[in-house]
């Protein structure tokens, strides 16, 4: 895991504000990733029947009644490193219609064989190029630490995320995710997930201005296909009131 520690140190020097904006990936990272030599495709789709009706910045996509998604292409490099590409990121909203919104590169470092361990840890880095209607800043990034416990049958996972628009450490935005899951079998699980955005480290937003969403999630996993569906409810005025998410994933080739 030494490479991940070096990466964290480098990122904290250059990373730095981000306004509330749309998100294409509603997922808590648990430290697992595809085997070395395997290509994987995860298709993310989200629909917001009742969302925030005002844009996060002038010209931004409006969340209310919008649909967005992205194919996530991943490749297992080693048993502790996975690389990925999100492309194309797309949205359909009531103002712009169908749009293309940018792309992301992802680098995930984790303890080897995380799915088989009781205590898991890792870190994920994302580097985004954004269209002008998707984010107020052209280039943004994410640092996502991963801390978790597989207690069989219960999983507890925490991602204390820091988002940045490269404008100073004090402007790093704290947006943690938490997942508590119960595994009925190796194939089926249910979970509660919380996605939050407290605001910049220099001074969190007031509670009513923070974003907090609570999701109920069902997961199915097999050798051929992984599937996740979730329903999210906003807990504050700044949150989308109702969001639906679907993720479908499968390996595209066999392990060498």
Tell what function each PLM region has.
Residues 1-25, 254-256:
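Cleavable N-terminal export/targeting peptides
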Residues 20-256:
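Transmembrane beta-barrel domains of Gram-negative outer membranes and organellar outer membranes
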């Amino acid at each position: 895991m030494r490479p991940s520690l070096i990466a964290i140190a480098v990122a904290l020097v250059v990373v730095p504000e981000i306004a509330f904006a749309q998100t294409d990936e509603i997922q808590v990272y648990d430290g697992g990733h595809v085997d070395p030599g395997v290509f994987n495709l995860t298709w993310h789709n989200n629909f917001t029947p009742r969302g925030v009706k005002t844009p996060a910045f002038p010209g931004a996509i409006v969340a209310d009644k919008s649909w967005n998604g992205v194919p996530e292409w991943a490749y297992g490099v080693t048993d502790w490193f996975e690389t990925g590409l999100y492309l194309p990121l797309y949205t359909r909203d009531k103002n712009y219609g169908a749009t293309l919104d940018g792309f992301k590169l992802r680098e995930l470092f984790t303890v080897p064989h995380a799915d088989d361990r009781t205590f898991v840890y890792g870190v994920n880095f994302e580097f985004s190029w954004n269209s002008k209607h998707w984010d107020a800043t052209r280039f943004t990034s994410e640092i996502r630490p991963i801390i978790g416990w597989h207690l069989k049958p219960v999983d507890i996972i925490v991602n204390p995320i820091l988002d940045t628009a490269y404008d100073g450490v004090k402007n790093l935005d704290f947006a943690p995710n938490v997942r508590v899951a119960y595994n009925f079998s190796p194939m089926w699980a249910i979970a509660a997930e919380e996605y939050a955005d407290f605001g910049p480290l220099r001074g969190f937003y007031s509670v009513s201005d923070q974003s907090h969403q609570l999701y109920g999630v069902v997961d199915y996993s097999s050798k051929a296909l992984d599937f996740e569906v979730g329903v999210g409810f906003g807990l504050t005025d700044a949150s989308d009131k109702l969001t639906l998410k679907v993720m479908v994933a499968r390996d595209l080739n066999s392990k060498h």
